[in-house]
Structures are given as structure tokens and as C-alpha cells.
């Protein structure tokens, strides 16, 4: 049986593909999440640096961009792809930064891997008063019929994996704080956008999710065949993939 910690760190085994196929959030999302004039921004659970690169591309660029990631294999790609960022080993439950040292903490596609009881106090500790926590989920827009069918393939694999490993319930998609936490109630914004994707890129994207990575070789090969069969039925080899970026923003309060 693959435990949750193994799943959480499974992405490093496909770090190059993760970097190649996982989408970045649109710039409009970061514009809303990062406070004006932010001098120091932390990308927490940074993966291979998709959000880190977006932060560094901003004008004006924050004077300090820090990326914290627990997996050494992901950090190696991150460091190579994000020269100029400060890349550190660490995790949300133990952030290797001093108190009140950053103006924004961004967490993309990773909130569900954190333990909020331990991570929230760490996030509030490193945030300056007036700074923001931004949590990002970027997902495919299944209001489009072919995307709904494509998502069903991914969901089937994930649910089979959860049943096999003894997991239950939906991934955590809300941000809540314990009573007394000096953070404002989260505000929400959604940004729609699209990405040009080839069939090969779509197949590669599904291969970067933990539910697929941790399948045994036989099940993974069967999953790949079904994905390829679905893509071969489509009347295109390249398509604009509709996406939704859901953002939650909370401000660090005094206290």
C-alpha cells in the first residue's frame, strides 16, 4: 500500500514531465493575489517553479522571490528553471523563513497536501501584517463536453487509486482558519483562460498526477491505452484547452 506521504512526494519521479505539462496560473490571478509593492514573495510547495516563474516575470519584480519545496528532485528542476529565485528545502508545516519576512505566500495545486493545523500557524508567522495568503487551483473547464469526458478518465484513475489505498473524500478545496487566527476570511475570484495543447501534451498532463504515478505498471499501461484511445477519437491533434483558475485570498491581520 502506498501511504499518503509517498503519494505527496511521488511527483519528483516525473519532475521533468511535471514541469513540461503542468499549466501555470494566468498573470491576472497573481495580480489579484499579490499585494501592490510586495518586496518579498514566497511560493510554498513550489514544485518545479511554475508560479515562481510567474512571480519573477512581474513588473516590478519583487526584490526577493523564495521557493520552498520538500522534494529534492523537484527542487533541482526548480533551481535550474528559476535562476535568481531563492530555492529552499522545506514544507508548509515547517517554513524555513524568519517571522514576518514575506508580503505574500502563494500555494498552487498543493493546499490539499498540507496539514492546515500545522501549516496555517507557519504561514501566519512568516507573513507581515497586511500581507496575503493566496491559494490557487487551476483546473480544466468540464462545461465543455470533450473536457468533461477527458476529466472523467482522470477521475476514474484517481478514485480507483483512492479506493485501493484506503483514502476517501474529496480533495480539500476550501481554506478555513482555526478561531483566533489573524487572517481575514478568504475572498474568491475565478479567472478563465485557455491553453493550446497537442494530444501528446494532454496525455502527458494526465501522467503527472499522483493517482497515475503511483499505479502499478500494468494498471498505468492500461490507463495510458485508454487515454490514447480517447485522444485518437478526437477530430483534432491540437486544441485550445479551456481552464478555470480559482483563487482564494486572505490578508494577514494584526495579532
Model segments located where?
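Class I SAM-dependent methyltransferase SAM/SAH-binding core
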Residues: 40, 48-94
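Conserved beta-strand/loop positions that form the S-adenosyl-L-methionine
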Residues: 44
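A short acidic, Gly/Pro-enriched loop at the edge of an enzyme's catalytic core
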Residues: 93-104
